């Protein structure tokens, strides 16, 4: 199914979550650009290329939401302790997992898939002996704010980030979720 196709059917009971396969990374990169690009998200081509090189090398990991064999959601996260220095002032313990991307197909938005992906990472983190998860978003991105709130993330703070944010307040909000 083409990535850009609008999906109007309700989520089926066949929805499942699985690790990304190396042989689908090219497709998932296109999916991320096509479904994740909007005024709030920072998706520089060179940064995403580097992100997918890390995925191919097994440095980072990705989880895919699949409906009837079609990827409809994606979350990318790093290894414990691998947190961008930009966020270090907001965390006390570096034994955390940084979630770099969460994207849901536009035809599936508002159905809880992003929250479900985050909850799956929270479940995995509990088995990895980490203290928390860290994620960021544009301060004014209400859809991301709600998704993260539903998954139990709380804001640690916001900072002016004109290098990555070109609209609205130009602030990034850093959030965390303690691992149970």
Show the residue positions of the predicted features.
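Conserved acetyl-CoA-binding loop-helix of GNAT-fold acetyltransferases
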Residues: 104, 110-123, 146-150
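A short, internal acetyl-CoA/4′-phosphopantetheine-binding micro-motif in the GNAT/acyltransferase core
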Residues: 93-94, 100-109, 137-138
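Conserved catalytic-core motifs of GNAT/GCN5-like acyltransferases
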Residues: 136, 149-169
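Conserved acyl-donor/pantetheine-binding loop and adjacent beta-alpha core of acyl/acetyltransferases
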Residues: 74-101, 162-166
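Conserved GNAT acetyl-CoA-binding A-motif
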Residues: 125-137
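A short beta-loop-alpha structural element at the N-terminal edge
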Residues: 12-30
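Conserved beta-strand-loop-alpha-helix junction that forms the acyl-donor binding cleft
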Residues: 135-145
